[in-house]
């Protein structure tokens, strides 16, 4: 299983450095997971970065279509407590800590 955060997920919809790698890895393993936050964060970013291009509507729709193939990991109170510890211990941003805490809730050892 591959766990993707918002920055990896966005590389499927916006061509940028790392997009080819993300596409290849996600083709090689069809079991994907992400925190429920990843969809909201990705859709808002697509709208913000692609507004005025006319592409944001299509890309948000594609993300919604593909979201059905992603195991959505809930962000609950336990996840947020875990995120707080990760964020404080490793001095990382809040959203990154939440994504990492959600990844820890997946059974087994997902790839990142």
Label each residue range with its predicted role.
Residues 6-7, 15, 30, 66-68, ...:
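Preference for short coil/turn "hinge" residues that link or interrupt alpha-helices
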Residues 8, 44, 99-102:
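Hydrophobic side chains within alpha-helical segments
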Residues 25-27, 65-68, 106-107:
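Short glycine-enriched loop/turn motifs at secondary-structure junctions
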Residues 40-86:
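Active-site-proximal, substrate-binding regions of enzyme catalytic domains
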Residues 70-112:
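Active-site neighborhoods of divalent-metal-dependent phosphate/nucleic-acid chemistry enzymes
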Residues 1-38, 49-61:
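Short, well-structured N-terminal submotif of metal-dependent ribonuclease cores
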């Amino acid at each position: 299983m591959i766990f993707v955060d918002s920055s990896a997920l966005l590389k499927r919809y916006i061509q940028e450095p790392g997009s080819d790698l993300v596409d290849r890895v996600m083709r090689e393993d069809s079991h994907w997971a992400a925190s429920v936050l990843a969809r909201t964060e990705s859709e808002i970013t697509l709208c913000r970065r692609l507004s005025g291009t006319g592409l944001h509507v299509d890309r948000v729709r594609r993300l919604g279509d593909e979201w059905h193939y992603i195991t959505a990991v809930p962000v609950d109170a336990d996840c947020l407590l875990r995120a707080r510890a990760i964020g404080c211990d490793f001095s990382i941003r809040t959203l990154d800590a939440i994504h990492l805490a959600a990844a820890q809730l997946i059974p087994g050892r997902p790839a990142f």
